[in-house]
């Protein structure tokens, strides 16, 4: 299969995506499979994707073992680059079931469980339990309906008929129950990645635009100076995550730890009295620019496809943009007091040198 991928495509990629609307909705988990090829290889690519999906083999135990080891090694190598993202996911995981599920699928808990699976396989010298789990997941995937996105030239679609089997069935899976643990992960890093998360809102909530603008104001108006310029971290900021309905603070490659969490708290207090019109205008411009950023024709089409999967219409996207533009300082102060004064959860990735200091955070 790898030889065929190299012959006809630029590779086949697969990833899971969790789509949510409100905290009361069940959410949806999608497996996204993508590839690209020349027009002349369009049919071969399509057939290869279907074959790879439907005819996956689980009898090559050594190959599965190797792939799991490669998967773990790549994720461990990415800790220094993505430590702030992993810390934010960990901090948010206690706030709601969506965050907890995302953490299990792509966070440090996923890496921890993968390493535990390898350790167990080595101990019992048997991969059958893992293979059984993979086969169960595979059977759920291939029995679910799927949607097709294709971006190509008109010529490639001439006389083309898609022959995808669409089995109308549902595979329901419960979301992960969040825990109340404050987690610190000890790594080989010489620095810290600090994160603090608060319960936020979904994209459809009227407060979502103000929270997005507030995140940018906090980053540019306070966190950059306090944590990067004065504290020596490589970066710091805040993020309004409408996928997991959380609001997050983070620092990146940070030589300090407890001082950073103090800075997060000070940033919240600063937002209640010190936001200027310039802060507001710059933040609105930044958020609108991210909404309006130009994409390639394929990128635009993919963007529309993903929004359609989430049942977000063009009208809703334009309304969201307008609500961002209409944000006032009073709106930012209101959402800061409403959401960022509640209970939060903290998480840290840090080296051994920080181990004792973590107990007091």
Regions found by a protein language model. Give the residues of each.
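M16 family metallopeptidases and their MPP-like homologs
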Residues: 1-55, 61-124, 143-152, 194-210, ...
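Aromatic-residue-lined binding/catalytic grooves and analogous aromatic/hydrophobic interfacial grooves
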Residues: 124-128, 135-137
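Extended beta-strand-rich architecture
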Residues: 153-186, 197, 203, 216
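Short, low-order "capping/linker" segments at domain edges
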Residues: 182-191, 293
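Conserved small/polar residues in nucleotide/adenosyl-binding loops
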Residues: 359-361
């Amino acid at each position: 299969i790898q030889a065929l991928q190299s012959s006809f495509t630029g590779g086949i990629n697969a990833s899971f995506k969790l789509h949510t609307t409100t905290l009361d909705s069940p959410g949806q988990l999608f497996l996204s499979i993508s590839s690209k090829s020349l027009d002349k290889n369009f049919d071969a690519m399509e057939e290869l994707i279907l074959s790879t999906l439907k005819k996956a083999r689980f009898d090559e135990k050594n190959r599965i073992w190797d792939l799991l080891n490669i998967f773990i090694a790549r994720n461990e190598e990415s800790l220094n680059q993505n430590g702030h993202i992993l810390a934010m996911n960990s901090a948010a995981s206690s706030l709601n079931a969506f965050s907890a599920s995302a953490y299990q699928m792509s966070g440090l808990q996923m890496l921890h469980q993968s390493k535990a699976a390898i350790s167990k396989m080595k101990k019992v010298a048997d991969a059958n339990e893992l293979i059984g789990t993979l086969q169960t997941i595979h059977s759920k995937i291939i029995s679910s309906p799927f949607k097709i996105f294709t971006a190509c030239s008109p010529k490639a679609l001439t006389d083309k008929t898609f022959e995808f089997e669409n089995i109308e069935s549902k595979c329901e899976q419960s979301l992960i129950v969040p825990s109340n643990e404050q987690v610190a992960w000890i790594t080989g890093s010489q620095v810290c990645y600090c994160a603090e998360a608060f319960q936020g809102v979904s994209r459809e909530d009227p407060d979502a635009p103000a929270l997005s603008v507030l995140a940018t104001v906090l980053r540019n108006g306070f966190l950059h100076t306090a944590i990067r310029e004065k504290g020596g971290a490589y970066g710091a900021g805040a993020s309004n995550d409408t996928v997991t309905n959380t609001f997050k603070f983070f620092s990146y490659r940070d030589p300090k730890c407890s001082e950073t969490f103090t800075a997060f708290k000070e940033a919240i207090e600063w937002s209640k009295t010190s936001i200027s019109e310039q802060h507001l205008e710059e933040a609105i411009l930044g958020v609108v620019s991210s909404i309006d950023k130009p994409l390639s024709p394929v990128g635009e089409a993919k963007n529309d496809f993903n929004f359609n999967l989430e049942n977000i219409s063009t009208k809703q996207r334009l309304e969201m943009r307008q609500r961002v533009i209409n944000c006032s300082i009073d709106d930012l102060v209101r959402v800061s007091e409403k959401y960022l004064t509640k209970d939060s959860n903290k998480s840290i990735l840090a080296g051994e040198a920080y181990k004792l200091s973590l107990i007091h955070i």
